From Swiss-Prot:
Assembly mode: Microtubule inner protein component of sperm flagellar doublet microtubules.
Keyword Nuclease: no
Function: Microtubule inner protein (MIP) part of the dynein-decorated doublet microtubules (DMTs) in cilia axoneme, which is required for motile cilia beating.
GO biological process: flagellated sperm motility
Swiss-Prot/TrEMBL keywords: Cell projection, Cilium, Cytoplasm, Cytoskeleton, Flagellum
GO cellular component: axonemal A tubule inner sheath; axonemal microtubule; sperm flagellum
Domain of life: Eukaryota
InterPro entries xrefs: CF161, MIR_dom_sf
Alphabetical list of SUPFAM superfamilies matching this protein: MIR domain
Encoding gene (name): Cfap161
Statement: the UniProt record of this protein carries the keyword Cytoplasm: yes
Signal peptide (from-to): none
Locations listed in the record: Cytoplasm, Cytoskeleton, Cilium axoneme; Cytoplasm, Cytoskeleton, Flagellum axoneme
Protein name: Cilia- and flagella-associated protein 161
Length: 303
């Protein structure tokens, strides 16, 4: 019968190589931890930078100005003709970095994706700055008017590099992930593809309002200057992003039977709350309208 002739103190196999390998792994781990190159450390830095709380600009005259920090919100809408799951609530435009590439480098990949998320809290990933396109040379603090070009920039990465919301015609190799329509991304290049325009909500009054100031916290339509496509959100198409499940954002104009842009094309440039700098104007409670129907019925008043 076979017996083990070696005692418990005898080492077998390539034990010396295994010891050196374990020591090398530990030394490599400690070096990466000191340099902050561990995956968990990169993940924490990225989330801390992107999710940092931001303070929006407060509009004193009720209009939007160049240099203002705003969040771009698609207001809540009722269930439309889309089939399947439909996301309700106010959705804000956010940058959506690639999950793998965001953990391999401190800088975000270019181009960087965008999506819509169900939050209106101002943070690093959804706070945009309204900038001049360079051609009209508008000064900071000047009012933005309908039909005027502007750029939407967002500070990204640990160095705070400015990225610009951009779009271009779709091709066979370049289109949105879910719908296959014209995609919207963020880039660090300053080109004519970064220009956007605000259009009045009512198309019958759009020509009359051209050249008038754009009011903050009111519904508008944001058109891409180069392709003449409106910014849109698909509440029924979900993307798996670095922060979870979010909605797809594209550049496509959806018109109803009256040639009016559908709610998925309607956006608001939301500014800060003057009462509480950490909140937005959407957090201000609206005046409650008293319901007098029960009182009128009790008094015998027919309405």
């Amino acid at each position: 019968m076979a017996q083990n002739v070696y005692g418990p103190g005898v080492r077998m196999g390539n034990w010396n190589e295994d010891v050196y390998l374990e020591e090398e792994r530990m030394r490599h781990f400690l070096e990466k931890r000191e340099k902050g190159e561990l995956l968990i450390q990169r993940n924490r830095r990225v989330k801390k930078n992107i999710l940092r709380p931001m303070q929006l600009s407060v509009s004193e005259d009720g209009y939007v100005h160049y240099g203002d920090k705003v969040i771009i919100v698609n207001p809540d809408q009722v269930l439309g003709e889309e089939a399947g799951k439909f996301m309700r609530g106010d959705l804000s435009l956010c940058m959506s970095p690639d999950e793998v590439k965001a953990q391999l480098s401190d800088d975000l990949e270019i181009p960087c994706g965008v999506s819509a998320v169900q939050t209106i809290a101002p943070m690093g990933r959804n706070t945009f700055t309204i900038l001049s396109d360079g051609a009209n040379s508008c000064e900071m603090g000047q009012v933005v008017v309908y039909g005027q070009n502007f750029c939407l920039g967002i500070a990204a990465g640990l160095e705070g590099k400015m990225l610009y919301l951009t779009s271009d015609h779709r091709t066979l190799l370049k289109s949105s992930l879910k719908s296959g329509l014209q995609e919207v991304t963020l880039t660090d290049e300053v080109t004519h593809l970064n220009c956007w325009q605000a259009a009045f909500l009512d198309p019958q009054l759009r020509l009359e309002y051209e050249g008038f100031p754009v009011r903050a916290n009111e519904k508008i339509v944001i058109y891409h200057r180069h392709t003449n496509r409106a910014l849109a959100v698909h509440r029924n198409l979900f993307l798996r992003t670095y922060f979870g499940k979010e909605m797809e954002v594209v550049a496509h104009t959806y018109l109803d039977s009256h040639k009016v842009e559908k709610p998925k094309n309607q956006w608001m440039l939301v500014t800060g709350n003057p009462r509480n700098k950490s909140n937005t104007m959407l957090d201000i409670s609206k005046p409650i309208t008293e319901d007098t129907r029960a009182l009128e019925q009790a008094m015998g008043i027919n309405t």
